[in-house]
Amino acid sequence: ILNEIKKVQDLLGLSLIYISHDIAVIAEMTDKIAVMYAGSIVEIGPTKDVFKTPKHSYTRALLDSTPSIRGEKKKLRSLDGEPPSLINEITGCSFSPRCPTPTEKCKNQSVEMNLIKVGENHFADECCSGCV
């Protein structure tokens, strides 16, 4: 089915939005990716660039938790802790409680989500872009 969607997309020059946790599908089907955590975009850019050089800790964790059929076997990563409750408004860095390498700025929860340029057409949350 995905191949048929891709054919129609290419034939008609359509843009499509895929929402998925399936990293393999995203890698195959998209040119640009937006990674979201707790309802906010934490990294966005060309799929190849984001996969090759992730700049946000959550993106890195997603990639490290994905099995590969190529190369040597590796232990898949999982994140400690629980995702934040989305019932109440989140202020500051929503990922810091689960981040393996949070900065002091992230931990103090006084930051707001702000995407900064980290590469050509590649942007990541300012708070966590130094945590990878």
What are these regions (language model features)?
Residues 47-132:
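Charged, flexible cofactor/metal-binding loops and thiol motifs
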Residues 1-74:
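P-loop NTP-binding/switch modules centered on Walker-like glycine-rich loops
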